Swiss-Prot record:
This is Ribonuclease 3. Homodimer. CDD domains: DSRM_RNAse_III_family, RIBOc. It comes from Coxiella burnetii (strain RSA 493 / Nine Mile phase I). The gene is rnc. SMART domains: DSRM, RIBOc. Gene3D superfamilies: 3.30.160.20, Ribonuclease III domain.
Amino acid sequence: MNHLNKLMERLGHQFNNLELLKIALTHCSSGADNNERLEFLGDSVLGFIIASELYQRRPQAREGDLSRMRASMVNGDELAQMSTKLGINEYLQLGVGEQKSGGKRRRSILADALEAIVGAIYIDAGLETCRRCVLNWYGERVDDLSKLSPKKDAKSLLQEWLQARRLPLPTYEVKITGEAHAQTFTVNCYVKGLPHKTEGVNTTRRRAEQIAAKRFLELLDDGKGDGITERDQ
């Protein structure tokens, strides 16, 4: 019995070309054919599927609200949790160093692998099969799309706060450390004319920027940072 049969059962798709699934599970640290190209494709396919569902289920929502709702459905945390729920982490192929450093628990690796699998299913069986699988993974969250509230992320709220007061837009300075497959992003956020400077650190640039923006908001007098998320948008 193929060791990937159990995973394919969880995914809801039996691959015609099993090599596609194997590549989707292979991280760039392994030194073999890896999942980066499939991840690139899967990111777009996943975004389209969720955007299409939102468009149909939220006919009154504006473009900006639709964008924020889509981002909340496909952000790194959401995808990493779904990847773990499907048991994808059990089948990942990593390099020795990445394996020892806990790569099978790394949020970015889990999210990337899920996107790569979306790309692999799309190539293997087409859009409709891919759509069926993706919507099944999301489960009840798909039914909740009609009730989903479009929350703004920290960077958007900070920009709106500054624009309302005719202040300059924030500057985000980024420093990258670590190997290519295990990078850490340190982002400093500041605004010309204001005394504050905040820092955000994460394994993705966008999330580090959100953390820095949220911390900056929390320093402002009216407490705009309360209750917002550091969503990876």
